[in-house]
């Protein structure tokens, strides 16, 4: 087993499946992923929400960033990139778990990739 991989947490999967998406428009995110021509508004929505909520702990599997995250929108490729410094150390938009500290409670927000939802 590679050092970069770790067992998938089934409890996390179960928790995600029970979410009612209180902070993001779930359908809008799915539209963004399935139709690149409609991605811009959904991408801006995600970017604005992440900025507004002041994310404390970001987990991008298998990498973990415990600091504020910048979101870069690549309009030509129709993808979102998350990085430490305005596009530096970019991570492709594939499988992302965002933990947000909101009103002293931890909210787990997930984003679907074009192939699977996590």
Where are these regions (language model features)?
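Ribonuclease/tRNase effector modules and their secretory precursors
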Residues: 1-118
């Amino acid at each position: 087993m590679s050092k970069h991989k770790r067992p998938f947490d089934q409890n996390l999967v179960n928790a995600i499946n029970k979410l009612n998406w209180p902070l993001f428009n779930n359908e809008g995110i799915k539209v963004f992923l399935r139709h690149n021509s409609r991605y811009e508004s959904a991408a801006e929505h995600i970017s604005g929400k992440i900025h507004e909520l002041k994310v404390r702990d970001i987990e991008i599997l298998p990498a973990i960033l415990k600091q504020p995250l910048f979101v870069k929108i690549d309009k030509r490729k129709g993808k979102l990139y998350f990085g430490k410094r305005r596009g530096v150390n970019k991570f492709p938009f594939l499988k992302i778990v965002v933990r947000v500290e909101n009103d002293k409670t931890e909210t787990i927000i997930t984003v679907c990739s074009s192939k699977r939802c996590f």
